[in-house]
A protein has these predicted regions:
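Globin-like tetrapyrrole-binding proteins
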Residues: 1-129
Length: 129
């Protein structure tokens, strides 16, 4: 298995076993970074949160399947710029997703998975301006 296929398989396993991770991801995000809750004050129905997670998962999946995600990442970063979301804050969302995925997969999540995720995040961070 390549590093990217570890991510692809992990994401497929989590989706098959647990479905929607929206509640878990945002619970951990706001527990870890309570100050980020203010960024979602106008998200009355959770649509922004669902869209943000869906976009992030699509980026992860595209990367894991060998796709080029540079334009998608740059576009997502740019759309967050108007909300004063720095590249560092933007990248932290992928940390949160990893923590949820690793927790869900428990013993299935190995050092190799962790390294593959770190490599992916390094590639994502490299797209920051």
């Amino acid at each position: 298995m390549t590093d990217r296929s570890l991510i692809a398989n992990a994401m497929a396993d989590v989706e098959a076993q647990y479905g929607d991770l929206n509640d878990e991801v945002y619970a951990l995000l706001f527990e870890t970074y309570p100050e980020y809750l203010d960024l979602f004050l106008l998200d009355y129905d959770g649509g922004v949160r669902r869209n943000m997670l869906r976009t992030s998962l699509e980026i992860i999946t595209n990367y894991a399947e060998g796709g080029d995600v540079v334009n998608r990442l740059e576009g997502a970063r740019l759309s967050h710029f108007t909300y004063e979301v720095s590249d560092e804050i933007f990248d932290q969302f992928f940390d949160i997703i990893e923590q949820v995925v690793a927790t869900k997969l428990a013993a299935q999540w190995t050092r190799e998975h962790r390294q593959a995720w770190q490599d992916m995040q390094a590639a994502f961070t490299a797209t920051a301006s």
